[in-house]
């Protein structure tokens, strides 16, 4: 991780912990979860919002007013809205994407959930996704949500990333392994 990215992650981690703790005390984890999903979607869909959080052209006051308006319009819960306002006054809104990832991870942990990133050569059917989620849930003892992506260059099989573990059952990886073994032999 590069130094600026690690600084952003550290800043976001502190804010995420504080916001999560406040929401937990107020028994507002479900509301916070919905807010995180909505704000993540808004950030992905709005170039203006991404510009607002990253551009040094905006003053603290302009960022604070704009983020307060966004929070009010979206009906964000008090812990998150107040946290965003504080981040704006401290010129820390650039860490918003990392904050949202940190909050999503904390919420998932509190709910006993994990997210698995699955990349497959072809789209998984609903039955395949359900069976994979059930198998992973059995291994981890937690509810598993799947983030599914398709990469046709894998030829066949899938890559599953669950926490710090990665399971690669792709044809592409097996061919690469076979190629390496053949290079060693001859």
UniProtKB/Swiss-Prot annotation:
InterPro entries: ATP_synth_OSCP/delta_N_sf (IPR026015), ATPase_OSCP/d_CS (IPR020781), ATPase_OSCP/dsu (IPR000711). One of its GO terms (molecular function) is proton-transporting ATP synthase activity, rotational mechanism. Keywords: ATP synthesis, CF(1), Hydrogen ion transport, Ion transport, Membrane, Transport. It holds the Pfam family OSCP. One of its GO terms (cellular component) is proton-transporting ATP synthase complex. The keyword Ion transport applies. The keyword Nucleotide-binding does not apply. Transmembrane segments: none annotated. It is found in: Cellular chromatophore membrane. It is a peripheral membrane protein. Gene3D superfamilies: N-terminal domain of the delta subunit of the F1F0-ATP synthase (1.10.520.20). F-type ATPases have 2 components, F(1) - the catalytic core - and F(0) - the membrane proton channel. F(1) has five subunits: alpha(3), beta(3), gamma(1), delta(1), epsilon(1). F(0) has three main subunits: a(1), b(2) and c(10-14). The alpha and beta chains form an alternating ring which encloses part of the gamma chain. F(1) is attached to F(0) by a central stalk formed by the gamma and epsilon chains, while a peripheral stalk is formed by the delta and b chains. F(1)F(0) ATP synthase produces ATP from ADP in the presence of a proton or sodium gradient. F-type ATPases consist of two structural domains, F(1) containing the extramembraneous catalytic core and F(0) containing the membrane proton channel, linked together by a central stalk and a peripheral stalk. During catalysis, ATP synthesis in the catalytic domain of F(1) is coupled via a rotary mechanism of the central stalk subunits to proton translocation. This protein is part of the stalk that links CF(0) to CF(1). It either transmits conformational changes from CF(0) to CF(1) or is implicated in proton conduction. Belongs to the ATPase delta chain family. This is ATP synthase subunit delta.
């Amino acid at each position: 991780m590069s130094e600026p990215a690690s600084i952003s992650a550290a800043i976001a981690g502190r804010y995420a912990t504080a916001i999560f703790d406040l929401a937990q005390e107020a028994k507002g984890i479900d509301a916070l979860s919905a807010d995180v999903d909505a704000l993540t979607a808004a950030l992905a869909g709005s170039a203006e919002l991404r510009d607002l959080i990253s551009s040094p052209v905006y003053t603290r006051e302009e960022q604070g007013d704009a983020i307060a308006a966004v929070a009010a319009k979206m009906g964000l819960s008090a812990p998150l809205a107040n946290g965003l306002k504080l981040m704006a006054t401290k010129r820390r809104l650039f860490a918003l994407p990392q904050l949202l990832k940190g909050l999503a991870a904390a919420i998932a942990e509190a709910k006993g959930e994990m997210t698995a990133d699955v990349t497959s050569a072809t789209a998984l059917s609903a039955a395949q996704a359900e069976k994979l989620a059930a198998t992973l849930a059995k291994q981890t003892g937690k509810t598993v949500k799947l983030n599914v992506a398709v990469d046709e260059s894998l030829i066949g099989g899938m890559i599953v990333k669950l926490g710090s573990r990665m399971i690669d059952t792709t044809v592409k990886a097996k061919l690469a392994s076979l190629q390496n073994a053949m290079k060693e032999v001859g």
